[in-house]
C-alpha cells in the first residue's frame, strides 16, 4: 500500500536509545496571570514551537534559518474559554479565545531524543533519511481536527 500524501505536522513516535518511551510532554505557559496578551498565533498539534524571551512559547513559522532553537512539538493545550468552560484543545485558538484573567497552558513534547514522523511535500531521496531538513510550512493547520498541516519541503 502506498503512503498517503497528507500533511500532519510532527508526530513523536519513539525516542532514540534504549529508554522507556512514554510520549511524555511538559507544560509551558501561553500567557501569564491572564494579564499579559500571550500568543495570538494559532498553534496546532504537531506544530514546532519556540521559547520566547517573555517566557512564553509560540509557533516557529518557517523554521529554516531561524535564530531561536526549537523547543519541541505542540501536543495540545488547556484554557478557560470566554464562556467560562474549562477546555482541553488539540489547537491553541489564540489569546482572544480565553476568558480574561485566566491562564493557558501548552503541552509540548520537548525531549531532545524524541524521534518524529512527518510527511514530505514530494519524493525524498534515500540520502535524506536521518538527515536534517527544512519545513515547507509550519504555520498552517486545521481547526476542525486541531492538527498541523506542516510538512517537509
Task: Show which residues each predicted segment covers.
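Surface-exposed, low-hydrophobicity beta-strand/loop segments enriched in small/polar/acidic residues
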Residues: 1-153
Amino acid at each position: 500500500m502506498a503512503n498517503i500524501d497528507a500533511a500532519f505536522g510532527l508526530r513523536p513516535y519513539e525516542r532514540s536509545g534504549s529508554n522507556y518511551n512514554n510520549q511524555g510532554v511538559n507544560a509551558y505557559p501561553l500567557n501569564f496571570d491572564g494579564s499579559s496578551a500571550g500568543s495570538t498565533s494559532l498553534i496546532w498539534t504537531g506544530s514546532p514551537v519556540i521559547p520566547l524571551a517573555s517566557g512564553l512559547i509560540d509557533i516557529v513559522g518557517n523554521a529554516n534559518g531561524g535564530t531561536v532553537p526549537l523547543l519541541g512539538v505542540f501536543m495540545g493545550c488547556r484554557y478557560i474559554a470566554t464562556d467560562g468552560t474549562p477546555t482541553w484543545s488539540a489547537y491553541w485558538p489564540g489569546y482572544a479565545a480565553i476568558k480574561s484573567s485566566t491562564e493557558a497552558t501548552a503541552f509540548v513534547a520537548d525531549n531532545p531524543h524524541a524521534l518524529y514522523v512527518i510527511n514530505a511535500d514530494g519524493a525524498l531521496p534515500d540520502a535524506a533519511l536521518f538527515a536534517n531538513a527544512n519545513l515547507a510550512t509550519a504555520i498552517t493547520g486545521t481547526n476542525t481536527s486541531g492538527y498541523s498541516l506542516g510538512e517537509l519541503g
